[in-house]
Amino acid sequence: MKNSAHFCFAVLALSAAVSTQAARPVEFTVGSEYYNETYREYEQDGSRLMQQKGNLWSINAGVKYRFNDRHAAKLEGRYSRGKTDYTGSVQYITEDYIDDSASYGSATLKNAPRHAYDIRALYEYTLPINDRFSIAAGAGLGHRVLRDLSSRIDPNDYDRKNRTTYAQINTGVNIALPANFEISPRIAYNRAVKGRQYSYEPDQVETRMKQGGGQGIEVEVPISKKFANGSKISLTPFYRGWQVKESNFTVTEEYDSYGLGSIEPKNHTHEKGVRLQYSF
């Protein structure tokens, strides 16, 4: 989180070295989005271990500072919440062994609360090709947090939290259309630079695991209508995806000849939805 804030301040400091500002240097954006999320965990052999699927609503906000017509810095944030349905398999745990032979689908949990937020600081460069077409590219840092609150539905279940700091590079085009419409396809690649997974068992201390090595993509196609006062409204279908490797093994209980612990399996996340926002 601190890395993202430091990066944003460093980018904004570049304004002192730029002599020609854009006519309207500051742009604010507010909006909302609705998306379907599917989260899956996998065994080493590729078989599915569990799935969470549900719908989430988001509140989005951002600010963009243009140093001139080509250089800009952006700070974007999103807070999401919704409910997911869990599908997995029953595990029978005793002092002597763990029996996980039950088939996938033998355990379910409905309407578990899920919260998420994502904040990022980005630099953006825009290259005009002609009056109706330009190319944009950018890079920056982001921080995302996901929280599963299953214990609110089943007190015997456990809660989870994931924190990931990531780097992003992105590119896209801006195409002006008749009647002051615009379409701006964009694609981004995310790479995790630090990841932590936390588990909160009932009546137990926090279990912390390192889970880095994640990567993801974002694809969006904003369709915008510009107004005479310089503001615009945008409708944006989008896709966000992540693939994260298995975490390290964390010992939670130690005995004379062996130890018990936790590991977070490799997982994939898919988010598909639509965003409505207003920029002014």
Where are these regions (language model features)?
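Short glycine/proline- and aromatic-enriched beta-strand/turn motifs that initiate or cap beta-hairpins
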Residues: Q21-G88, I93-Y97, K266, Q277-F280
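Outer-membrane beta-barrel channels and translocator barrels
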Residues: A23, R66-R70, P128-R132, A176-N180, ...
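Membrane-embedded beta-strand positions of outer-membrane beta-barrel proteins
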Residues: F28-S32, A61, A73-G77, A121, ...
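Transmembrane beta-strands of outer-membrane beta-barrel pores
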Residues: S32-T38, Y79-D85, Y125, L141-R147, ...
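Extracellular loop and loop/strand-boundary signature of outer-membrane beta-barrel proteins
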Residues: R40-Q51, D85-T87, D96-N111, S150-R160, ...
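Residues that define the transmembrane beta-barrel architecture of outer-membrane proteins
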Residues: K53-I59, N111-I119, F133, K161-A167, ...
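Outer-membrane pore/translocation modules
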Residues: G82-Q168
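Predominantly the C-terminal beta-signal and adjacent terminal strand-loop region
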Residues: D203-F280
